[in-house]
Amino acid sequence: MRATLQIAAPAVFIAALASCSGADAESPTLRVSGIPDSSGTEIDALARAVESYLGEELGMKVEYINATNYDAAVAMIGSNKVDLGWFGGVTGVDAVDACNGEARMIATREKDLQFKTYFIANRAVVDAGKVGPVDSLEALKPKLSDLSFTFGNLRSTSGHIMPRHFMTAAGIDLESGVRGGAKHQNNHTMTLDMVADGRVDVGALNYTNYDGASDEKKEQAVKIYETPTYVDYCMVARGSLGDEMIAKIQAAFTQLDAAKPEHRAMLNAFKAEKFVAAESSQWQMIRDVVKSLQDKGQLK
């Protein structure tokens, strides 16, 4: 059974190199975990893929440790309980800051350099003519006052921070401009389910979660808007891993090739086609957006 670290917070991928005691003292373990941004089934598949692939590539034991939420993932890497983590853009910045400069982004999926959020609406609401596909959030603004709306997790880049940023820029008040005020779900899967089931009229979520959903689910949750692009998920490594180990981990990700059968489980688990090397400076725009929302009193 995989261990679960419970700390009041959201989810993401993390890993730490820990020396074992006793007979296993010379057999270090790379402990890995991640933000729970999707369903438990998807996180379990990710855990199995990481343990298997990184274990073989690095020639060592790899253990995936579940984090109960996003904050727990950030707390683990910040307190040196793990050394490597797969984060969203916002939690990635949080993770680097939590390590007081002793951590950096080392890899990202190629598509994360051009990521986006989808706004979706319940089929019945669309069929009733209350909302439909729009070319801008300004066009969506007058319709939202009579509709319920949900974001994803509070620290989700694609499920909350960036869509809130774009909605604010369009002049949408997330309290008075939405029926009942904007709500939040724990992850993207829950957002999609809530909208598809009609428990919420409109929602914002990670586009890959929507694109990968069943046709039946997408029939009940209609895509009505696609945001401009931004940078998102990233692999963050603590400097305590050492340059040699960090280079090996980075290479293990950037060498993943969809044409190789042995790499498909890993790529599928990450919903990725390719990984590329990354630098922390690429996430400056995320820092700027977070600061802007904080300055406006919309984010703590």
Regions found by a protein language model. Give the residues of each.
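Periplasmic-binding protein-like
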Residues: I35-P36, R109-Y118, D215-F253, D257, ...
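C-terminal motif of bacterial Sec signal peptides marking the signal peptidase cleavage site
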Residues: L17-S19
